[in-house]
Swiss-Prot record:
It is an enzyme of class 4 (lyase). Pathway: Nitrogen metabolism; (S)-allantoin degradation. This is Ureidoglycolate lyase. It catalyses: (S)-ureidoglycolate = urea + glyoxylate. Homodimer. The lineage of its organism: Eukaryota, Fungi, Dikarya, Ascomycota, Taphrinomycotina. InterPro entries: RmlC_Cupin_sf (IPR011051), UAH_cupin (IPR047233), Ureidogly_lyase (IPR007247), Ureidoglycolate_lyase_dom_sf (IPR024060). Pfam families: Ureidogly_lyase (PF04115). Catalyzes the catabolism of the allantoin degradation intermediate (S)-ureidoglycolate, generating urea and glyoxylate. Involved in the utilization of allantoin as secondary nitrogen source when primary sources are limiting. GO terms for molecular function: ureidoglycolate hydrolase activity; ureidoglycolate lyase activity.
Protein backbone atom coordinates (compact mmCIF):
# COMPACT_ATOMS: atom_id res chain seq x y z
CA UNK A 1 0.00 0.00 0.00
CA UNK A 2 1.29 3.48 -0.83
CA UNK A 3 2.44 5.58 2.09
CA UNK A 4 0.49 8.67 3.09
CA UNK A 5 2.71 11.74 2.70
CA UNK A 6 2.90 14.59 5.21
CA UNK A 7 5.30 17.49 5.73
CA UNK A 8 6.90 18.19 9.09
CA UNK A 9 6.39 21.68 10.45
CA UNK A 10 8.53 23.65 12.87
CA UNK A 11 7.89 22.75 16.50
CA UNK A 12 5.95 25.58 18.17
CA UNK A 13 3.96 25.82 21.40
CA UNK A 14 0.73 26.52 19.55
CA UNK A 15 0.99 23.74 16.97
CA UNK A 16 2.07 21.10 19.50
CA UNK A 17 -0.40 22.07 22.28
CA UNK A 18 -2.95 19.29 21.51
CA UNK A 19 -0.21 16.70 22.13
CA UNK A 20 1.81 18.16 25.00
CA UNK A 21 4.23 21.00 25.56
CA UNK A 22 7.47 22.32 24.13
CA UNK A 23 10.28 22.59 26.69
CA UNK A 24 12.42 25.60 25.88
CA UNK A 25 13.52 28.95 27.20
CA UNK A 26 10.60 31.33 26.76
CA UNK A 27 10.31 35.03 27.46
CA UNK A 28 6.77 34.69 28.83
CA UNK A 29 7.76 32.20 31.56
CA UNK A 30 8.39 33.53 35.06
CA UNK A 31 12.09 33.71 35.86
CA UNK A 32 13.79 34.18 39.22
CA UNK A 33 17.39 34.62 40.26
CA UNK A 34 18.95 31.45 41.67
CA UNK A 35 22.24 30.06 42.98
CA UNK A 36 23.28 33.26 44.70
CA UNK A 37 22.61 35.34 41.60
CA UNK A 38 24.73 33.26 39.21
CA UNK A 39 21.77 31.68 37.41
CA UNK A 40 18.31 32.39 36.05
CA UNK A 41 15.67 29.82 36.97
CA UNK A 42 12.79 29.57 34.50
CA UNK A 43 9.78 28.28 36.42
CA UNK A 44 7.39 25.54 35.36
CA UNK A 45 8.51 25.13 31.75
CA UNK A 46 6.76 21.74 31.62
CA UNK A 47 4.81 19.44 33.93
CA UNK A 48 5.41 15.78 34.70
CA UNK A 49 2.11 14.05 35.41
CA UNK A 50 1.27 10.47 36.27
CA UNK A 51 -2.21 8.93 36.43
CA UNK A 52 -1.33 5.37 37.45
CA UNK A 53 -4.21 5.37 39.95
CA UNK A 54 -6.41 4.86 36.85
CA UNK A 55 -4.54 1.62 36.07
CA UNK A 56 -6.00 -1.74 37.10
CA UNK A 57 -2.54 -2.68 38.39
CA UNK A 58 -1.67 -2.09 42.02
CA UNK A 59 2.03 -1.77 41.25
CA UNK A 60 4.02 1.10 42.73
CA UNK A 61 5.14 3.72 40.24
CA UNK A 62 8.27 5.82 40.31
CA UNK A 63 9.75 8.63 38.28
CA UNK A 64 12.72 7.55 36.18
CA UNK A 65 15.31 9.28 34.04
CA UNK A 66 16.65 7.40 31.02
CA UNK A 67 19.16 8.27 28.31
CA UNK A 68 18.51 7.44 24.67
CA UNK A 69 21.60 7.36 22.48
CA UNK A 70 20.04 7.41 19.03
CA UNK A 71 21.63 6.84 15.67
CA UNK A 72 20.33 9.19 12.99
CA UNK A 73 17.26 7.91 11.20
CA UNK A 74 17.03 10.90 8.88
CA UNK A 75 20.07 11.58 6.73
CA UNK A 76 19.84 14.99 5.08
CA UNK A 77 21.02 14.92 1.52
CA UNK A 78 22.11 17.92 -0.49
CA UNK A 79 18.57 18.47 -1.69
CA UNK A 80 15.83 20.49 -0.04
CA UNK A 81 13.95 17.65 1.70
CA UNK A 82 14.68 14.40 3.51
CA UNK A 83 12.09 11.71 4.17
CA UNK A 84 11.36 9.14 6.85
CA UNK A 85 8.64 6.48 7.04
CA UNK A 86 6.70 5.93 10.25
CA UNK A 87 4.92 2.61 10.74
CA UNK A 88 5.01 2.33 14.55
CA UNK A 89 3.53 4.57 17.23
CA UNK A 90 3.65 4.16 20.99
CA UNK A 91 1.96 5.76 23.96
CA UNK A 92 2.36 5.85 27.71
CA UNK A 93 -1.25 5.76 28.91
CA UNK A 94 -0.67 6.90 32.49
CA UNK A 95 2.30 9.26 32.29
CA UNK A 96 3.75 12.21 30.48
CA UNK A 97 7.12 11.62 28.83
CA UNK A 98 9.71 14.36 28.40
CA UNK A 99 12.71 14.32 26.04
CA UNK A 100 15.57 16.82 26.29
CA UNK A 101 18.26 16.72 23.57
CA UNK A 102 21.87 16.94 24.69
CA UNK A 103 24.97 18.01 22.76
CA UNK A 104 23.19 19.55 19.76
CA UNK A 105 23.53 23.21 18.82
CA UNK A 106 20.50 25.26 19.76
CA UNK A 107 19.41 26.19 16.25
CA UNK A 108 20.17 22.95 14.40
CA UNK A 109 17.45 20.51 13.37
CA UNK A 110 17.89 17.76 15.96
CA UNK A 111 14.96 15.35 15.86
CA UNK A 112 11.60 14.57 14.31
CA UNK A 113 8.40 14.27 16.33
CA UNK A 114 5.39 12.45 14.89
CA UNK A 115 2.12 12.30 16.83
CA UNK A 116 -1.42 11.10 16.22
CA UNK A 117 -4.65 11.67 18.14
CA UNK A 118 -6.74 8.80 19.44
CA UNK A 119 -9.31 7.31 17.08
CA UNK A 120 -12.74 6.51 18.60
CA UNK A 121 -11.52 2.97 19.41
CA UNK A 122 -8.55 4.35 21.39
CA UNK A 123 -6.00 3.32 18.77
CA UNK A 124 -3.96 5.90 16.81
CA UNK A 125 -5.80 7.87 14.15
CA UNK A 126 -3.09 7.36 11.53
CA UNK A 127 -4.86 9.64 9.03
CA UNK A 128 -4.45 12.58 11.43
CA UNK A 129 -0.72 12.07 12.05
CA UNK A 130 1.24 15.30 12.36
CA UNK A 131 5.00 15.80 12.35
CA UNK A 132 7.28 18.47 13.79
CA UNK A 133 10.99 19.24 13.59
CA UNK A 134 12.59 20.11 16.93
CA UNK A 135 15.77 22.14 17.20
CA UNK A 136 18.63 21.40 19.56
CA UNK A 137 17.34 23.83 22.21
CA UNK A 138 13.83 22.34 22.25
CA UNK A 139 12.67 19.51 24.43
CA UNK A 140 9.19 18.06 24.29
CA UNK A 141 6.73 16.64 26.80
CA UNK A 142 4.13 14.24 25.42
CA UNK A 143 0.87 14.32 27.36
CA UNK A 144 -0.21 11.03 28.95
CA UNK A 145 -1.81 8.77 26.35
CA UNK A 146 -0.50 10.61 23.26
CA UNK A 147 0.49 8.34 20.39
CA UNK A 148 3.98 9.23 19.16
CA UNK A 149 6.73 7.76 17.04
CA UNK A 150 9.85 6.39 18.70
CA UNK A 151 12.68 8.93 18.70
CA UNK A 152 13.88 9.89 15.21
CA UNK A 153 17.06 11.97 15.13
CA UNK A 154 18.29 14.03 12.21
CA UNK A 155 21.78 13.99 10.75
CA UNK A 156 23.94 12.62 13.56
CA UNK A 157 23.96 10.53 16.70
CA UNK A 158 22.08 12.31 19.47
CA UNK A 159 21.79 11.74 23.19
CA UNK A 160 18.42 12.53 24.73
CA UNK A 161 17.51 12.57 28.40
CA UNK A 162 13.99 11.27 29.03
CA UNK A 163 11.77 11.43 32.11
CA UNK A 164 8.55 9.54 32.76
CA UNK A 165 6.91 7.43 35.43
CA UNK A 166 6.87 3.61 35.34
CA UNK A 167 5.25 0.88 37.41
CA UNK A 168 6.94 -2.12 35.75
CA UNK A 169 3.74 -3.45 34.14
CA UNK A 170 4.44 -3.50 30.40
CA UNK A 171 0.89 -2.65 29.25
CA UNK A 172 0.69 0.21 31.76
CA UNK A 173 4.07 1.67 30.87
CA UNK A 174 4.10 1.52 27.05
CA UNK A 175 1.61 0.44 24.38
CA UNK A 176 2.74 -0.01 20.77
CA UNK A 177 0.74 -0.09 17.53
CA UNK A 178 1.93 -0.60 13.97
CA UNK A 179 0.36 -0.08 10.57
CA UNK A 180 0.80 -1.67 7.16
CA UNK A 181 0.17 1.77 5.63
CA UNK A 182 3.17 3.81 6.74
CA UNK A 183 3.27 7.59 6.93
CA UNK A 184 6.04 9.17 4.87
CA UNK A 185 7.21 12.36 6.56
CA UNK A 186 9.07 14.94 4.49
CA UNK A 187 11.42 17.25 6.34
CA UNK A 188 12.56 20.55 4.88
CA UNK A 189 16.27 20.69 5.56
CA UNK A 190 17.55 24.01 6.87
CA UNK A 191 20.96 25.10 5.70
Amino acid sequence: MEAKKIYAQALTDEAFAPFGSVVQQKDDVKMVSANGGTAKKYLKVSESIQNYEKSSSASTRKGVWNFFSTHPSVHPANDEHAAFQISVLERHPFTTQTFIPMCRSSDEQAYLIAVAPNAPDGMPDWNQTQAFVAKGAQGVTYSAGVWHAPMVTIGKETMLAAFNYENGVAEDDCQVQSTESPIEVFIKIST
